[in-house]
Amino acid sequence: MAKGKRTFQPNNRRRARVHGFRTRMRTRAGRAIVAARRRKGREKLTA
């Protein structure tokens, strides 16, 4: 029985563009995510 292809195809540029710091800072919701992670004390705020 054939399985589908692996869904995670790593790509650093896409990773940064979709989950990066500058992208997060663009929207109010994104800034809220970063703020929440700062409050929690996360070492890494964004990808």
UniProtKB/Swiss-Prot annotation:
In terms of PROSITE patterns, this protein maps to: RIBOSOMAL_L34 (PS00784)
Q: Which GO biological process annotations does it have?
A: translation
Q: Where is this region: Disordered?
A: 1-28
The record ties this protein, via Pfam families, to:
Ribosomal_L34
Which key words are in the record? Ribonucleoprotein, Ribosomal protein
What are the recorded GO MF terms, alphabetically?
Answer: structural constituent of ribosome
Its GO CC terms are: ribonucleoprotein complex; ribosome
Q: Is Acyltransferase set as a keyword in this record?
A: no
Q: State the family named in the UniProt similarity comment for this chain.
A: Belongs to the bacterial ribosomal protein bL34 family.
- Matching HAMAP family: Ribosomal_bL34
Q: Which PANTHER family match?
A: LARGE RIBOSOMAL SUBUNIT PROTEIN BL34M, MITOCHONDRIAL RIBOSOMAL PROTEIN 34 FAMILY MEMBER
**Cross-referenced NCBIfam families:** rpmH_bact
Query: What is the protein's given name?
Result: Large ribosomal subunit protein bL34
